[in-house]
């Protein structure tokens, strides 16, 4: 199916089909939510000769906004004295979500005896025993959150949000957490650097 260099490779077929389609229209425009995706489009053989615009995604900041951390923790039944690390993914085990990197980071934190009362909040996915057993701190799985208010509560209850994604066209969770006033740690990949200002509202790690 995927055989690089071969004419009948599926990706080559899709490329030719798209190239034929795009060449039919002179008024075809492309919009990118991140500078990274914008640069990719400008370099692509499919779109480099087409107008490409960088238009960041928007967010309803009447829903995602800072609220009192103590109140958020009270609603979620999270201990007020804990240092809370939040992480969100529909499929935690997806290699693109960077779970293995977060796991290693948590193991390093555990080795620091000066750090006490750390807990981890995971939302977006159901309880996963393998993941839970791999985390050296108290962990709560919040499940799939059905509304923005509940998601906002998690961001506000957290001291830091971790976005270890290895591939992200934009990264809505990053924007949501920052809009709630919660610093974000993430890799300098995809659209994440568009939102995290290194050591100002978060930390950009090299990948």
Residue ranges and their predicted role:
Residues 113-117, 124-152, 156:
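Nucleotide-activated donor-binding/catalytic signature segment of Leloir-type glycosyltransferases, i.e.
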